Amino acid sequence: INSKELAITHLFAVPAPLQFMMQHPEFNSTDFSRLINVGVGGAPCAEIIIKTWQSKGIDVIQGWGMTETSPAGIFLAAEDSLNKIGSAGKAVLHTEIKIVNKNMKAVELNEIGELLIKGPNVTPGYWNNEKATKESFHEGWLKTGDLAKFDSDGFVFIVDREKDMYITGGENVYPAEVENILYQLDEIAELAIIGIP
């Protein structure tokens, strides 16, 4: 990164290595001036990671996708990285997304539901597995298993995996939200929140 001749200009990573780099003793003294942007995806990214890299003057570009979406489905453009921290962005070209409740009805703005996606980049089904295909699709829409919400500008915020949510005290608790809060503590290097019955 410090080499004038060989310095990288673009970096893509899942959140963990970005966090590990932040914890390196030389992180604060490293010259990141040639690094234009950091792309992050593959797992929920704690806001502290986004804010820390952005404080270095680096655009953090987030995205969401899965193998079934070849792989991109949602993308947050660099110009939105500061004003939409925590968002995965908007649907990629020729792709449609919606967020629905358990009855497959569209949810209101800022209401959490399951993210559905369809488009030419989305698989038509699972090879030789009609059961999995039937369970994973609803009227041509892929049911992702991810919980998300739209803000008033149409940006998608991934909340967590549906199977990771747990209920305590009558409240829905999303591990990623708890992790985002705990990551703000200097004493926390790495953590994972798991609901135990």
What does each model-identified segment do?
Residues H94-E96, E139, T144-G145, A189:
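Short loop/turn microsegments at loop-to-beta-strand junctions
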Residues P17-L18, C45, V122:
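Alpha-helix capping/helix-boundary segments
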Residues N2, H24-P25, N129, G169, ...:
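Residue-level signal for well-ordered alpha-helical positions
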Residues I74, K90-H94, K105-S136, E171-V173:
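Conserved ATP/PPi-binding loop(s) of AMP-dependent carboxylate-activating enzymes
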Residues V100-N101, L109, T144, F150:
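Hydrophobic alpha-helical segments, especially N-terminal targeting/anchoring helices
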Residues L11-V14, N103, G119, P124-G125, ...:
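AMP-binding/adenylate-forming catalytic core of the ANL superfamily
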